[in-house]
Amino acid sequence: MGTRSRRPQLLWLLLLCGTCARVCGCNETRMLERLPRCGKTFAERMREVAVWKWCDLSQFIVFYESFTNCTEEETVVVGCYWPNPLAQGFITGVHRQFFSNCTVDRTHWEDPPDEVLIPLIAVPILLTVAMTGLVVWRSKRTDQLP
């Protein structure tokens, strides 16, 4: 009988706690205090991976997923939405710390030399003009036949 009388109280407590974050707003100070925990855990896990493998996502994807989930949970716990500019700045800092040397060398594309480029442009244009002329000439010729 005592537990039945507590159920409405528990329900009200859950409803109040669920809306507290929305009513109280985002506590950015607490968020910035809590996010480094995620970064510390991620850094400890990244020590298990050889530095030269830090650019190979398959080597640390599980750690990175945990890091992302941790930042999301810590942000939501203090009543903030995720992602937000402060959390994003923190995540960017972690990226700079671990992945700043992971730039991808992109192939620099250059135009071919003029000796190759001019025929590649001119031949289709001349073929188009020649075929159009041929079609016009043939259509005029059929009109003249009895």
Curated annotation (Swiss-Prot):
Membrane topology qualifier: Single-pass type I membrane protein
Signal sequence residues: 1-21
Alphabetical list of InterPro entries matching this protein: RAMP (IPR006985), RAMP_sf (IPR038126)
GO biological process: calcium ion transport; cellular response to estradiol stimulus; cellular response to hormone stimulus; G protein-coupled receptor signaling pathway involved in heart process; intracellular protein transport; positive regulation of protein localization to plasma membrane; protein localization to plasma membrane; receptor internalization
Coiled coil: none
GTP-binding in keyword set: no
Keywords: Cell membrane, Disulfide bond, Glycoprotein, Membrane, Receptor, Signal, Transmembrane, Transmembrane helix, Transport
Transmembrane portions of the chain: 117-136
UniProt topological domain (Extracellular) ranges: 22-116
GO cellular component: cell surface; plasma membrane; receptor complex
Subcellular location: Cell membrane; Membrane
Annotated disulfide bonds: 38-70, 55-102
Chain ranges on the Cytoplasmic side, renumbered to this chain: 137-146
Top-level taxon in the UniProt lineage: Eukaryota
Role, per record: Plays a role in cardioprotection by reducing cardiac hypertrophy and perivascular fibrosis in a GPER1-dependent manner. Transports the calcitonin gene-related peptide type 1 receptor (CALCRL) and GPER1 to the plasma membrane. Acts as a receptor for adrenomedullin (AM) together with CALCRL.
Family: Belongs to the RAMP family.
Subunit details: Heterodimer of CALCRL and RAMP3. Interacts with GPER1.
Name of the featured protein: Receptor activity-modifying protein 3
Gene this protein is translated from: RAMP3
